[in-house]
Amino acid sequence: MNRITVAIIVALLIGLGGIAVWTSLNTEKFDVNAYDTTKVIAADNNNGQIADHYRGKEGASIILVEYADLQCPGCATMMPKISKLYKEYGDRIGFVFRSYPIQGHPNARSASAAIESANKQGFFWETLEALYDNRIDWINVSDTEKRTNVYADIFSKATDGKGDVEKFKKDLNDSNIQKKIDFDKTLGGKKDKVTATPTIMINGEMLDIEHASDIAKLIEDKINEYLEKDGQKTGPAETEE
């Protein structure tokens, strides 16, 4: 299949709402079934030698996975909910973040590259939260150079000036970072059947957040359900007065 044919097919698919199919045309082929998406995925050649972004207790039996598009407003409002739950349950659960940039969001992929670039300096989570907090500054910037400078400014502030801004800019175009983004999206689309963002999965079970009246409660209830099954204490950790 030549590039022109692929471009035509992609255009038709987008017109029909087939956004999720883009992944299979845009990435190198690999066996998605070789990966257990309910666990933390290690670095290998398919993901550009970039492991899953994980925070929480090592070896946690309950893993919450989020597939997110940084340009998605729902993902921006989801992050504080997950951060709160992580603080309350972090000694018993783990949290994995995977990128799933939607085709209709023109700056989503570059934002994913920004957090991966920050990750190379150890500032993934700080930059992720900063990009969400300042999304109004970059979501509509179409000029590549201007957008890069906005990302760099957000990165610098998120790291309190400790990050190397020039390295950050250079790494935005790292081929391994692009490979990691494609890898995450392919796993989401082909293995976990992600069709929208944010998508939340707990131990492989996809939560129906679209129809939930209280998303935070839905996630917390599911966490407690799995904690109970695992014989662990349910509810938030007790805090000292």
Spans of features found by a protein language model:
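Residue-level detector of conserved, well-ordered beta-strand and adjacent loop positions
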Residues: 56, 65, 208
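Short secondary-structure boundary/capping elements
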Residues: 45-47, 77, 180
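C-terminal cap of thioredoxin/glutaredoxin-like
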Residues: 1-30, 153-241
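Ser/Thr/Pro/Gly-rich low-complexity linker/stalk segments immediately outside membranes or between
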Residues: 25-41
